[in-house]
Amino acid sequence: FMKVIDPGTKWCGPGNKAADDTDNGKN
């Protein structure tokens, strides 16, 4: 599952999905 990269955010993946959700407040 991938999405557009926001500033300071990486591609959403199994290893960083939680951190990505925290950074963006959404999936």
Swiss-Prot record:
Q: Which Gene3D superfamilies match?
A: Phospholipase A2 domain
- Can you supply one Gene Ontology CC term for this chain's record? extracellular region
Primary location group: secreted
Q: Which GO terms describe its molecular function?
A: metal ion binding; phospholipase A2 activity
Q: Where does Ca(2+) bind?
A: 11, 13, 15
Could you tell me the superkingdom of the organism this chain comes from? Eukaryota
The cofactor named in the record is: Ca(2+)
In short, the EC number is 3.1.1.4
Q: In which tissues is it expressed?
A: Expressed by the venom gland.
Pfam families with a match to the protein in the record? Phospholip_A2_2
**Where do Basic and acidic residues bias regions lie?**
18-27
Q: Which residues form the signal peptide?
A: none
Q: Which reaction does it catalyse?
A: a 1,2-diacyl-sn-glycero-3-phosphocholine + H2O = a 1-acyl-sn-glycero-3-phosphocholine + a fatty acid + H(+)
Q: Does the keyword Endoplasmic reticulum apply?
A: no
Instruction: Name the Gene Ontology biological process terms.
Output: arachidonate secretion; lipid catabolic process; phospholipid metabolic process
Q: Does the keyword ATP-binding apply?
A: no
The family database entries (InterPro entries) matched by this protein are listed as: PLipase_A2_dom, PLipase_A2_dom_sf
Disordered: annotated segments:
1-27
Compartment(s) of residence: Secreted
The record's cofactor note says: Binds 1 Ca(2+) ion.
Keywords noted in UniProt = Calcium, Hydrolase, Lipid degradation, Lipid metabolism, Metal-binding, Secreted
Protein function: PLA2 catalyzes the calcium-dependent hydrolysis of the 2-acyl groups in 3-sn-phosphoglycerides.
Q: Which family does it belong to?
A: Belongs to the phospholipase A2 family.
The name on file for this protein is Phospholipase A2 2
Task: Name the source organism.
Answer: Opisthacanthus cayaporum
